[in-house]
From Swiss-Prot:
Origin superkingdom: Bacteria
Gene from which this protein is expressed: purA
Note accompanying the cofactor annotation: Binds 1 Mg(2+) ion per subunit.
SUPFAM superfamilies associated with the record: P-loop containing nucleoside triphosphate hydrolases
Native species: Mycobacterium sp. (strain KMS)
Name the UniProt record assigns to this protein: Adenylosuccinate synthetase
Amino acid sequence: MPAIVLIGAQWGDEGKGKATDLLGGRVQWVVRYQGGNNAGHTVVLPTGENFALHLIPSGILTPGVTNVIGNGVVVDPGVLLTELRGLEERGVDTERLLISADAHLLMPYHVAIDKVVERYAGSKKIGTTGRGIGPCYQDKIARQGIRVADVLDPAVLAEKIEGALELKNQVLVKIYNRKALEPAEVVENLLEQAEGFKHRIADARLLLNQALERDEIVLLEGSQGTLLDVDHGTYPYVTSSNPTAGGASVGSGIGPTRITTVLGILKAYTTRVGSGPFPTELFDEHGAYLAKTGGEVGVTTGRARRCGWFDAVIARYATRVNGITDYFLTKLDVLSSLETVPICVGYTIDGKRTDEMPMTQSDIARAEPVYEELPGWWEDISGAREFDDLPAKARDYVLRLEELAGAHVSCIGVGPGRDQTIVRRDVLAPS
């Protein structure tokens, strides 16, 4: 069987956890392929139980599914153990979680540097979560990182941490006037934490490719979203990894020819957390309505999300960049009770119209949305389970988004629950 990639098509928080949870009962593997605990997935089970996951794949909540933290992820050991403990206390079987030996470990000095750099950045700060993600990826690229497999050899681990702290302590003490970290203490704490996860360390790329050869289905789950991609997003207001479809292959060890379906997740409106351009952002009562009705507060940061109307320009861009084959449209129910529902179909920049993503960040920062207004609907759609159950105006809205985004809207979320979903096309069915 092929691998399937699940991609956020906006600035994150699109509802990827709901999509993974919906598909999880029909796949054998769920893989997190990038990011760290700077993002969160919310899953609401049929029982009404609400789970917020930050590092562990959403498939952990589905019996029988093997979950993998892939090589593209940066893992904070303390956060991992806390999340595992929280799941186990609620009766979740966590034995089905594996961690790639090649994933990088997020160290205390990464968090310390992240926080002081953001604080000193002043007006130029980018809105980092302060969890050390960026500095950890910096060390990975600079070939100074600590990998998960290093905890299996304490001597090698100690040597690597001592080498890293020779430089990190210089930065912390001499530039930022912070206290130096003791290498022996860092090593001791990490080895103690490793006792709680080293039995999970695995050659993930081998296991995943063997699973595909056995015709098992592998679901690759991204965090954040396309517009936060370090290469394809609204740079520099981005994350430090590649949440796009290309990152799924790199961050899991599964070759690109084995990926046949790319499922993009789109919210029926647009949100963003932190700094950066946001052409359709609302500062009026409509923005307040979307924030309140949609419960728009970040799962990981607790920060209020900025809210705006649906932006078809970035949706079309996400389709192109990721090769999206299908869309899962979430939170359509939030738009009920609006007299009209605007859709951004293009931008004007210095008086000139464009329907494509601006090439430069200065252009996108000046982009003014061009809206097309569709009539709203007043009916409660949370009980709809077939497309024809939706009011005609809601169906028209979905079909217009589909046309503008350039890929089929195969699933529609009409509420937070697993069962509050309309399936127009089975994305797991053989094509």
